[in-house]
């Protein structure tokens, strides 16, 4: 079987690329190991909602059209949205077709699947950045009788063993799950590492409205001094609750969650924690306030004072004067450790020498290094700060599909340009933001 381009993955990134390839009359196929939006259907917990408001679900040729633009979609609603998008754009998706190998050929690539082999000149890796839970090696040292659970396995508190829960990690996933489990009646201890605090609503508007309008989400990969760090920053402490409330360490301690420092070691059934909790929360508060300062400056420059509320600042994060540095898990009644320690992609099937020592694809803005015709989509800060979001897939797909068209046309592709000029929309202020 042949196609000019093979797109691996039928999530939002793969579907956005499909639409953009079709607009350029580039024949292609989208290969999906499960169903459209498969990860959203099978690898998320029951109560999870998108962290971005509904109006921000913008894909090429499609967007939100309901009556609740400021709400947050459930996973079922997200899946239905993406399934409908695939239908509207008539994406050539082959479901239940698992890619088992991608190999380089003289004239392109061989893509082996569970349903035969495809030959193509172009391969777009859009299989996602969250294929495997990044559970640290320390998990192997957990004492017997204590369950080890990743967010991909977690569904709801009732499915956990009765007793206390140690949640490791305090970014968006960690704080949401800690909040839910604590409210279920199971006592939670939260091990806090690097995190970025942010209010859900600021000056009467969703924080994503501010970041979108001020151009923060449009910061580009070629404008960032340390792109590797930017791609590995933790997600903002946000949740898509229907009541639009914020979730942060203060809201968690208010309902009884105990805070400890970063989990550093596990010895003889005792968890050992870093003594740097105070520094971590102070740095997180500093980053939040720096973000709010930038937003305020942008609002003032745009004369938005009459449209939004007054500037706000939030109480510093509260922690105990002497947080516990060690915890005997059995004596403390801990029965489950939940590892909210991030995710990583799975490229075990990619048999092309383009991975670095940590298993990441080496790329420049989504154009894979040293393998012409190979492209990447859907990872954090691929081309913009918003690249991993549903809202970020469109701009990236437009630019990379233009690069693909030039490549196929025999031209030497230049660096993909900016499909949407942000400066005339947000001004230079938004492009110089020193964001954490």
Locate each region found by the language model.
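Flavin (primarily FAD) cofactor-binding/catalytic cores of flavoenzymes
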Residues: 1-42, 72-425, 433-436
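N-terminal glycine-rich dinucleotide-binding loop that anchors FAD/FMN and/or NAD(P) in oxidoreductases
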Residues: 44-67, 208-223
